[in-house]
């Protein structure tokens, strides 16, 4: 099931310039999700990171992984309209390859564990088949107040 950017915006609250998932390529609710982020030179982070050699900040790659996982949570629950997904922990984040404008980040997230409102994930970002980033993280789903 392919989910385009318009539908992604129905599932998570993020918007430009902080929406970091362009398309979902595959989703298996309650299990895993795969999506992409096309990295372009006109993104605001590249004006300062770094002007002479633009590099995608590692923290934004982890954020893209978390946003993709939030889409997986929403699809697994059927909706998150009355809920919010908050990142709780990031563990063992590793950055193995520079990501720069022109690259396509292939993001994959897997649910490792889900207990009540706490979900644990493993995630990777690959570019041209090489691992760029990998991390484990935990998110909490709370009712909106």
Swiss-Prot record:
Assigned EC number: 4.2.1.59
Keyword terms: Cytoplasm, Lipid A biosynthesis, Lipid biosynthesis, Lipid metabolism, Lyase
Highest rank taxon of the organism: Bacteria
Chief location: cytoplasm
Any one GO BP annotation for this protein: lipid A biosynthetic process
Catalytic activity: a (3R)-hydroxyacyl-[ACP] = a (2E)-enoyl-[ACP] + H2O
Single GO MF descriptor: (3R)-hydroxyacyl-[acyl-carrier-protein] dehydratase activity
Pfam family, one: FabA
Active site: 49
Keyword Phosphoprotein part of the UniProt annotation: no
PANTHER family, sorted: 3-HYDROXYACYL-[ACYL-CARRIER-PROTEIN] DEHYDRATASE (PTHR30272:SF1)
Function as written in the Swiss-Prot or TrEMBL entry: Involved in unsaturated fatty acids biosynthesis. Catalyzes the dehydration of short chain beta-hydroxyacyl-ACPs and long chain saturated and unsaturated beta-hydroxyacyl-ACPs.
Family: Belongs to the thioester dehydratase family. FabZ subfamily.
Name of the protein in question: 3-hydroxyacyl-[acyl-carrier-protein] dehydratase FabZ
Species: Rickettsia conorii (strain ATCC VR-613 / Malish 7)
């Amino acid at each position: 099931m392919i989910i385009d950017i318009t539908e992604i915006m129905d599932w998570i609250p993020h918007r430009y310039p902080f929406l970091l998932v362009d398309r979902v390529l595959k989703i298996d609710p309650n299990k895993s999700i795969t999506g992409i982020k096309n990295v372009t030179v006109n993104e605001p982070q590249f004006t300062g990171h770094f002007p002479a050699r633009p590099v995608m900040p590692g923290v934004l790659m982890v954020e893209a992984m978390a946003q993709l996982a939030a889409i997986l949570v929403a699809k697994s629950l059927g909706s998150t309209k009355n809920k919010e997904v908050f990142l709780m922990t990031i563990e063992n984040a590793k950055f193995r390859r520079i990501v720069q404008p022109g690259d396509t980040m292939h993001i994959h997230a897997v649910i490792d564990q889900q207990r009540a409102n706490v979900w644990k994930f493993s995630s990777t970002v690959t570019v041209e088949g090489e691992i760029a980033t990998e991390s484990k993280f935990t998110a909490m789903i709370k009712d909106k107040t």
